Amino acid sequence: IQLTEQKTNFARGRLIEVVKPAAERIQPHCKHYGVCGGCHYQHMSYDLQLRAKRSILVDQLSRIGGLDGILVNEVILSPAQWNYRNSLQFHLHSQGWLGFQERGSNNLVQIQECFLPEPALDTLWRQLDFEPEMGIERIEVRCGAEEDLMVVLESSGYELPEFSVDIPLSAVHLSPVGEIVLAGDDHLMMMVDKHPFRVSAQSFFQVNTAQASVMVNYLLEKLPLKQNSTVLDV
């Protein structure tokens, strides 16, 4: 390991060589892993990932928050390890291809595969085709409750991009002048534990819909609620 940053009570480094792999070290699922900055734990078994995330939380509570002796329960596993995200955000290269930021830099990595988006999104982003120098900087794709699809085009310029669709979806352009609907609706309907949520193009929503349902039910079970209580996610 080569140290890249040294602080008083922690350090950062980058992997140079694996001399002897740990028993739980596995082959990453994605060919872009290690270069793409999106995923950090694909070299770990899923069980080890959960334990590592819990360990990181305990460390941050203690080292940063000064909270020692806090009981941190085991991490509740996700119903799906892959293809669980209802949204994905790409950067658009000036040559017209989609990419993610390279790990540790602002360079872009051209993406041929990603195992995080829901199946409908995975099909959608591969069908997107952009011309060079469109003035679009970021592309977000979203998937709603009934596999309704949305494409969000973000730019810092004021010019409206040329855009055409061959499949049923909603498209929204975000720029300094505001939000302009190019096709379909300005929102998607998301469903969490049979509760509908109207989510606009600029709204945050939990990216793992199935795990959001698990989280909501866990909180409802643990909170001291009365029959007429109202719970808000804010």
Name each model-derived stretch.
Residues 1-234:
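Accessory RNA-recognition modules of RNA-modification enzymes
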